[in-house]
């Protein structure tokens, strides 16, 4: 009987199936790492906004903030303009930010930085907050 060198069809199919399974697991793991990295970048940006709030307060005498706050592209742009003077900016892929002013009896007592994960054109399910006292829900 003449024996040819090479792999049988079954052996090739097994190898292709194993490579496919490894690729699927690897892709899911990679997407999880990317999502986690974006969330960490958003947390860092929120802390940077908090630091700029301290500087803004020392110059102006009050915190920057909006009476009502829903994270959007416009509110993120307003933060870049008002807190960072356009010299620096926060630009975290897939996240929008806003700053809400906290008041008691009509006077400003602090702020809350809000961030949301963009899902399409609206905020998704991941919402992060950081207040003037450093309390957060990271």
What residue ranges belong to the model's regions?
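N-terminal single-pass transmembrane signal-anchor helix
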Residues: 2-30
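A generic fold-level signal
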Residues: 4, 41, 106-108
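A generic structural signal for ordered secondary structure
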Residues: 8, 13-14, 41, 45-49, ...
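N-terminal hydrophobic or amphipathic segments with adjacent small-residue motifs
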Residues: 11-14, 18-20, 55, 109, ...
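Alpha-helical interaction segments
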Residues: 19-24, 28, 45-47, 53-54, ...
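Membrane-proximal N-terminal amphipathic helix
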Residues: 35-62
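Periplasmic/extracellular, small/polar-rich flexible segments of pilin-like filament-forming proteins
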Residues: 58-138
């Amino acid at each position: 009987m003449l024996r040819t060198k090479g792999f049988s069809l079954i052996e090739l199919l097994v190898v292709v199936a194993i490579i496919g399974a490894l690729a699927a697991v690897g892709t899911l793991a990679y997407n999880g790492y990317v999502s986690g990295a974006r969330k960490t970048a958003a947390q860092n940006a929120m802390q940077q906004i908090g630091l700029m709030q301290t500087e803004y307060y020392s110059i102006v005498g009050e915190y920057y903030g909006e009476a009502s706050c829903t994270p959007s592209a416009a509110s993120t742009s307003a933060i870049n303009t008002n807190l960072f003077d356009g010299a620096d900016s926060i630009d975290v892929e897939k996240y929008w930010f806003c700053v809400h002013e906290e008041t008691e009896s009509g006077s400003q007592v602090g702020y809350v930085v809000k961030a949301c994960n963009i899902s399409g054109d609206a905020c998704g399910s991941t919402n992060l907050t950081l207040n003037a006292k450093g309390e957060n829900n990271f």
